[in-house]
Amino acid sequence: MIPLFKVFMSEDVIKPVNEVLMSGQITQGPQVELFETALKDFMGNPYILTLNSATAGLTLALRLLKNKDDRFQWPGFDEDTDIVLTPALTCFATTAAVLANHVKIRWLDVDLNTANIDLVDLKNKLSAHTKVIYLVHWGGNPVDLDGLRELQEYSLQKFGFRPMIVEDCAHAFGAEYNGSKIGGKASEGNICVFSLQAIKHLTTGDGGFITLPNEFLYDRCKLLRWYGIDRDKRNYKGKDLRLENDILEYGYKFHMNDINATLGLYNLPHMNDLLRKNRENAAYFDEQLKDVKGIQLMNTNTKCNSAYWLYTIRVLNGKKQEFMEKMKESGIMTSQVHNRNDINSCVKDFQEPLPNLDLLERELVCIPVGWWLSEDDIRSIIKNCHIN
């Protein structure tokens, strides 16, 4: 079976991971600091913190935004009256993070051409209570961030504030917009959260990281990821940091450990080659599948350089299930990857019409595109897309 996903693990990790395991320092320590420094260099952003999952980062992001902060002109967030706009087509982690903060949800419909959020629908749902917008870069293909910034300005003129953007970048490690990395300059002013789970481009076994737009949120997030305690030993002059803290604001146990960080540190140097291979495969599929009857390819904005964690197609004319079954018979794994979140019982109070998603879920299929595909695999995928 040609897999839809595959774990990338560098052979370079074996010796350093063993050294960490035998060092006596396996929780958050020097390897976490080294990994964060490497990520800051790769992303071009000095405000990066590693975490034990992207779910933790998405939860922290909204928690950080509840407090008013005049230092970056943020009005704060009232969980009794304010709402979060969030996509329904995503991993449930996105939705779980909003629910964990006890905040009301309004679902955003999808753009049929990208599977990203529909900016027209978003504009129609902006209100005086829309303080935060979550988005997902579906498959690694960035959302139209310029269009999104125009809507932030629209909100400023109409309601007196710019909604804060939280980018769920679980699919989008290495993606670029206007020549800059998502999570770096391309995402200026936004909070971004990345997944380092097993099957992502960059993996730490499990984990994630968050990028912050300013020093104020960075410093506060650094506290909240470990109970609200300052772990910087330089501030304690030899005293026990566990005993010398007055916790001003409670936090969580969301930090990364040195074992996971070491995996990330030694996998990171391979990412540019991995991304290049995924993009080459995707470009070849674009050319070979563009005229296949019954299949519609997704659009990529010319400003975007997708990470291609997924290669998504639309199978038309009610043939989705038949197509997926025949691909399976031919030894090719396909999937929708994520189910729509709005149908779950725990969010039944927030349901509303999403006509584009109703259509797209009947057509959306992801086919293998990754760095692991051989030339024979690629030929088989293309051949079977034509046949099926």
Locate each region found by the language model.
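PLP-dependent aminotransferase class I/II
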Residues: V32-A38, F42-L49, T55, V120, ...
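PLP-dependent aminotransferase-like
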Residues: N67-A172, E176
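Short, conserved catalytic or interaction motifs in soluble domains
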Residues: V110, A198, V369
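Glycine-/small-residue-rich active-site loops that bind phosphorylated ligands and cofactors
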Residues: M9, T27, T90, N113-T114, ...
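N-terminal "arm"/small-domain region of PLP-dependent enzymes with the aminotransferase-like
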Residues: M1-I26, P30, D246-L248, P368
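Short beta-strand-to-turn element immediately C-terminal to the catalytic PLP-Schiff-base lysine
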Residues: F194-S195, G208-P213, L265
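Phosphate-binding glycine-rich loop
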Residues: Q25, G29-I83, A97-N101, W107
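Conserved active-site segment immediately N-terminal to the catalytic lysine
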Residues: G160-T204, D219, L243-L248, Q296
